[in-house]
């Protein structure tokens, strides 16, 4: 409880819960200490509330002018898929980029977030990315709220390289990606530049998303195709 500027706690209840938690997960002490210094270093803390809670070894790297905006809390790490993934999550922000965490967002172990120079990435409240996934934002990527993004998924808004054609034209290097609210993306998917995925859509495992997906649709395959409409899913 926050009372008159002082932090007050029901001590017997607090001690009992803390002892039980530490017995079940002794690594928690290390993670709490590490999270404290991570928040302190990036100046994203208040006295009694961590904005970032991270497993030991998870990293946040910011270039000059990069801004990490956290409305509520960003979780880095945790246990997913039976604790089979042990690599650490990372956030790397190049100069003048913005990563806006619009609520509570969870990035699982092995998840890598990269925002290129001047890029803007936003992720909505109650969205999680499970494990070993990559989000590379060179320009603009928006992920809505209540989304579930499974392991080994890649989301890109860039081709990385120019492709020149015989008629003296070339590919458009970057295009924004828009993922709506309450979208479920299965494991091993790739979402390419310029794609919009509508609200409540479901993307099946191993799908290459290279074109728009309407709301409330089930899309699968490579090449991707919509196989069901008016679908709903629950977490």
Regions found by a protein language model. Give the residues of each.
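Domain-scale signature associated with acetyltransferase and cell-envelope carbohydrate enzymes
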Residues: 2-156, 180-181, 199, 215, ...
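Short, flexible, glycine-rich and Lys/Arg-enriched loop motifs at helix boundaries
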Residues: 83-88, 161-168
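Beta-rich strand-turn-strand
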Residues: 136-140, 188-201, 207-211
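Conserved catalytic-core motifs of eukaryotic protein kinase domains, centered on the activation segment
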Residues: 159, 166-167, 195, 229-231
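Flexible glycine-rich beta->alpha loop in the catalytic core of nucleotide-sugar glycosyltransferases
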Residues: 160-161, 207-208, 214
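Glycine-rich NAD(P)-binding loop of Rossmann-like domains
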Residues: 168-179
């Amino acid at each position: 409880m926050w009372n008159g500027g002082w932090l007050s706690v029901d001590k017997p209840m607090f001690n009992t819960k803390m002892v039980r938690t530490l017995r079940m997960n002794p690594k928690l002490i290390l993670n709490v200490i590490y999270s404290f210094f991570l928040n302190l270093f990036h100046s994203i803390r208040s006295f009694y509330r961590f904005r970032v809670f991270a497993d030991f070894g998870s990293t946040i790297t910011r270039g000059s002018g990069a801004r990490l905006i956290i409305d509520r809390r960003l979780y880095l790490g945790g246990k997913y898929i039976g604790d089979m993934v042990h690599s650490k999550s990372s956030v790397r922000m190049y100069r003048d980029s913005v990563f806006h965490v619009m609520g509570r967002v969870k990035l699982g172990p092995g998840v890598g977030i990269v925002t290129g120079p001047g890029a803007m990435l936003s992720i909505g409240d109650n969205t999680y990315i499970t494990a070993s996934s990559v989000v590379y934002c060179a320009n603009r990527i928006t992920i809505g709220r209540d989304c579930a993004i499974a392991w080994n998924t890649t989301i890109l808004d860039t081709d990385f390289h120019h492709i020149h054609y015989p008629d003296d034209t070339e590919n458009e290097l970057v295009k924004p990606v828009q993922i709506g609210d309450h979208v479920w993306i299965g494991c091993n998917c790739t979402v390419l530049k310029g794609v919009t995925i509508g609200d409540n859509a479901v993307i099946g495992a191993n799908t290459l998303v290279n074109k728009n997906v309407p709301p409330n649709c089930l899309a699968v395959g490579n090449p991707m195709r919509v196989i069901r409409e008016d679908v709903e899913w629950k977490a």
